[in-house]
Amino acid sequence: MKTYFLVLCLAVLAVASKPVPFRADSLTISVGTFTSPSAVWHKGSPKHPQVFVWFHGGMQSSKCAKGYEAGGMLVPYLEKSQKENIVVSVSACKENHWLTPTVLKTVDVMLDSVEARFQIQIDTVSLVGVSDGGLGIAGYTLYGKRAVRARLLVSTNLSAVSDARNLSKAIRVRQGSWTFLQGGSDRLYPSNRTMPWLDEFCSVLGAKQCVIHFDNRGEHDWSWWTANREGWIRDFVP
């Protein structure tokens, strides 16, 4: 009897300690005539989560439903976190790119829907952008309605937004941290074009607020960074 009771207790303990997997829920967010396929990743019903917003690359692609899957690429880095986390991603598409007011508003409408669903308040967010998803980070930083705690920009080029010195002086840009992962073998955004901009941008913000991780072997795709510089990504995700 004692042995049976012990085995039963161990079985219950094993079930209780088994990590709860993230669940992905898909939805569409509409702003005016624009409809954005979107998704939210969560564990159960979080009460005080950190919220991450993923801005996908290929913002003017004719593949207009990237938001259904894009944010899922961050989930493996949150699985073992002791904190409650939510990831959301929306879709940009063709002329509705990351720097248009409509798509930037879509992000906040999505966050509003997450607030309503889980009965929580989202005051601050962390942003992750890959390739031209970095433009979404810049746009939301300047025009989004929520404060930004931290940003991770992977293989990006923000020179289309503004020159580095002027952008770094914007009040909202100076709130929250900036972390850049940039590669020397990025064929889309060559380092001889991107690094001078980044160096000037971070020189104004200062080393405590703005960090550049450069790998001369680094390629453009997120998959290269997950395979070769996973530690830099984990440093961003608590």
Which residue ranges define each predicted feature?
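Cell-envelope and extracellular/periplasmic
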Residues: 54-62, 115-118, 130, 137, ...
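Loop/turn elements at helix/coil->beta-strand transitions in domains of secreted/extracellular proteins
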Residues: 47-51, 83-86, 121-124, 145-151, ...
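The feature captures the conserved acid-bearing segment of alpha/beta-hydrolase catalytic domains
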Residues: 150, 155-230
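Short substrate-entry loop that stabilizes the transition state in hydrolases
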Residues: 48-97, 160
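Primarily recognizes the serine-hydrolase "nucleophile elbow" in alpha/beta-hydrolase
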Residues: 117, 123-172
